[in-house]
Regions:
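Extracellular/periplasmic periplasmic-binding protein-like sensory domains
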Residues: 174-194
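Extracellular/periplasmic Venus flytrap/periplasmic-binding protein
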Residues: 60, 67-178
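Beta-alpha junction/loop-to-helix N-cap segments that form part of ligand/metal-binding clefts
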Residues: 2-62, 71, 132-141, 164
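Cofactor-binding loop segments of dinucleotide-utilizing enzymes, especially the Rossmann-like FAD-
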Residues: 7, 102, 189-191
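Short beta-strand segments enriched in small/hydrophobic residues
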Residues: 1, 33-34, 96-101
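Short, well-ordered alpha-helical microsegments
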Residues: 38-40, 79, 167-168, 193-194
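A short helix->loop->beta-strand "cap" motif at the edges of active sites that frequently abuts
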Residues: 49-52, 123, 180-184
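Hydrophobic/aromatic residues located in beta-strands of well-ordered beta-sheets
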Residues: 2, 53, 97, 128, ...
Length: 194
């Protein structure tokens, strides 16, 4: 019998709900969590109670647990090849990269790895921008203005690790500022159907 719980993106509830599933509902396995924050909040519960979590989304790596199956792509399987593609002639031969993400583990770790990769491939530090916003951020006017300046002269791409409901206002403001894909291509890793 399947048990469904919804912590409603309230990070404090994730561990409590995981404990309920494992100890009260006696589930054999949990499929869930969507962010690194939620995964990291339940990890001690799964390890203490020898539970099994299937984590279904891309993740930043740098973590290994006997109690978690990481089924999503790690940075070297998704984000790094995507950026390498953007640097190639087939991908647009981009020379400038603006790393924009939500302020939590996955974007910060992913962008740390991407920044190191870009520098190792000869991209000057001045051609790498980096910025983070809180969860549920809605006002991208200033950030899109910075991207517009950064992209002046061409050859720029935005690497987006924005999460959740912040995507829609980002794309709207990107368009409101007259930016187009030819001005700054966007490579995004966490976009939903909204």
């Amino acid at each position: 019998e399947a048990k469904i719980v919804d912590p409603a993106s309230n990070w404090d509830l994730f561990a409590e709900k995981a404990k309920q599933l494992l100890l009260e509902d006696k589930v054999s396995v949990v499929f869930g969590c969507w962010t690194s924050v939620s995964r990291k909040s339940v990890l001690p519960v799964f390890e203490k109670n020898n539970g099994l979590l299937f984590y279904p989304v891309q993740y930043e790596g740098e973590e290994c647990s006997r109690n978690v199956f990481y089924t999503g792509a790690a940075v070297n399987q998704q984000a790094a090849p995507a950026v390498e593609y953007l640097m190639s002639p087939e991908g647009g031969n981009y020379k400038k990269f603006y790393l924009l993400g939500t302020d939590y583990v996955y974007p910060r770790t992913t962008n740390k790895i991407l920044r190191a990769m870009l520098l190792a491939k000869g991209v000057p530090a001045s051609n790498i921008g980096e910025e983070y916003t809180p969860f549920h951020h809605q006002d991208y006017q200033t950030i899109c203005g910075k991207i517009k300046k950064f992209a002046a002269g061409g050859g720029a791409a935005v690497i987006s690790t924005i999460n959740g409901d912040s995507n829609v206002p980002f794309y709207k403001e990107f368009g409101n500022q007259g930016l187009r894909a030819v001005d700054a291509a966007i490579m995004a890793f966490s976009v939903e159907e909204d």
